[in-house]
């Protein structure tokens, strides 16, 4: 609203239509069939909970923190354990954890690779968002309209295609050297770079040990996405939802409903996360598409001859992001966040990875406001 960018309510599009189907061990299963399936590895009281639901249901039902907003506090260090350990404490076997979380992890490569405290925060944050209501908004024409509007309001020049190579002291300020040799002096520097990109910069300032470790070791989420379009609504032929969760290579198929109405399915997003995303990256775009279309043709014969590859994107292979977002392993949440955003000389930091009260765009914006107050004279 501050930027006069028109917004559209899109939440109803995500909720529209049949819920995602479940394909497990060679079968399409309803919730009732899943609850009775011989291969269901969940405890008796959780048999009817779908694989995609159970990890989040347990995190919400049995939160480890009385106040999820304090997830990063040092006094919670004893709870800064692998999420896999928390799930085991709730009664899930290794087989159940592998199916419920490791196959499509929300954070980390698998449940052993992410802090229980980050998952507790995620559960609390998402719960607070849901409590505010079902509406969800996006900029009309794409969220890049927001950053374009922000750039248009800047008074100085925006220098594109100028990756930074080094930041070093210059008097009381800093000197920025770009890869092309161009140099720029400034009293203050604000870096919003994701840490994999920041690690590529030679920083000529002494960084405290905890902060240096946070900058060097914080991992980023592997996510790789394959977009497909279909020439016909195959789901009308087979009677299934266009979206589905599977235990195979196709993992998670999400219908995209960005037509004139939510009834129109404009495409399919197949998403790999964690270790499966890294496997996709190793195989490469063409091999992934070939295997996806082949597997979907077997799982859902109605798709045969109808699917077309459209766009493939690996966040891990992006030079200036190195992953979709920052996450924290066991032992990192209570050590890294407190030091992550401290100014280093004239260099200040913002970005989602520096924020502890929100994630996503909300976290990035909150951190940007904090950094602006740090560098603007009182």
Q: Which residues does each predicted region cover?
A:
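Short hydrophobic core segments
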Residues: 164, 183-196
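A short alpha-helix-loop-beta-strand transition element characteristic
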Residues: 2-19, 94-101, 235-240, 305
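Flavin (primarily FAD) binding-site architecture
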Residues: 191-209
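Central beta-strand plus flanking loop segment that forms part of the substrate or channel wall
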Residues: 210-239
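Active-site/ligand-binding neighborhood in enzyme catalytic cores
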Residues: 61-163, 171-173, 192, 202, ...
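Conserved flavin/dinucleotide-binding core of flavoenzymes
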Residues: 173-175, 222, 236-378
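Dinucleotide-binding Rossmann-like beta1-alpha1 core, especially the glycine-rich loop
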Residues: 1-52
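Conserved beta-strand-loop-beta-strand element in the redox core of flavoprotein oxidoreductases
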Residues: 168-184
């Amino acid at each position: 609203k501050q930027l006069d960018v028109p917004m559209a309510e899109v939440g109803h599009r995500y909720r529209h239509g049949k819920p995602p189907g479940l394909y497990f061990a060679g079968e399409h299963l309803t919730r009732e069939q899943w609850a009775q399936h011989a291969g269901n590895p969940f405890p008796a009281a959780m048999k009817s909970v779908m694989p995609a639901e159970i990890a989040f249901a347990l995190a919400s039902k049995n939160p480890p923190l009385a106040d999820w907003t304090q997830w990063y506090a040092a006094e919670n260090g004893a709870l800064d354990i692998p999420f896999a350990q928390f799930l085991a404490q709730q009664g899930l076997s290794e087989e159940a954890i592998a199916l419920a979380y490791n196959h499509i992890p929300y954070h980390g490569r698998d449940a052993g690779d992410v802090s229980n405290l980050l998952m507790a925060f995620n559960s609390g944050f998402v719960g607070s968002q849901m409590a505010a209501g079902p509406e969800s908004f996006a900029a009309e024409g794409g969220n890049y309209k927001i950053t374009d509007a922000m750039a248009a309001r800047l008074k100085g020049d925006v220098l594109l295609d100028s990756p930074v190579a080094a930041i070093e002291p210059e008097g009381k300020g800093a000197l920025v050297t770009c890869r092309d040799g161009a140099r720029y002096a400034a009293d203050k520097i604000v870096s919003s770079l994701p840490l994999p990109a920041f690690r590529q910069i030679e920083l000529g300032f002494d960084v405290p040990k905890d902060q240096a470790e946070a900058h060097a070791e914080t991992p980023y989420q592997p996510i790789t996405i394959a977009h497909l379009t279909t020439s016909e609504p195959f789901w009308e032929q087979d009677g299934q939802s266009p979206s589905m969760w599977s235990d195979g290579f196709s993992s998670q198929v999400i219908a995209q409903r960005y037509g004139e109405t939510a009834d129109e399915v404009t495409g399919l997003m197949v998403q790999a996360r964690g270790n499966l995303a890294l496997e996709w990256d190793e195989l490469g775009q063409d091999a992934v598409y070939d295997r996806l279309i082949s597997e979907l043709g077997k799982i859902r014969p109605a798709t045969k001859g109808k699917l077309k590859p459209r766009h493939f994107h690996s966040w891990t292979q992006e030079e200036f992001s190195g992953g979709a977002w920052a996450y924290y392993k066991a032992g990192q949440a209570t050590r890294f966040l407190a030091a992550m955003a401290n100014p280093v000389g004239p260099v200040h930091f913002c970005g989602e990875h520096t924020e502890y009260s929100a994630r996503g765009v909300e976290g990035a914006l909150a951190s940007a406001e904090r950094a602006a107050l740090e560098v603007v004279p009182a």
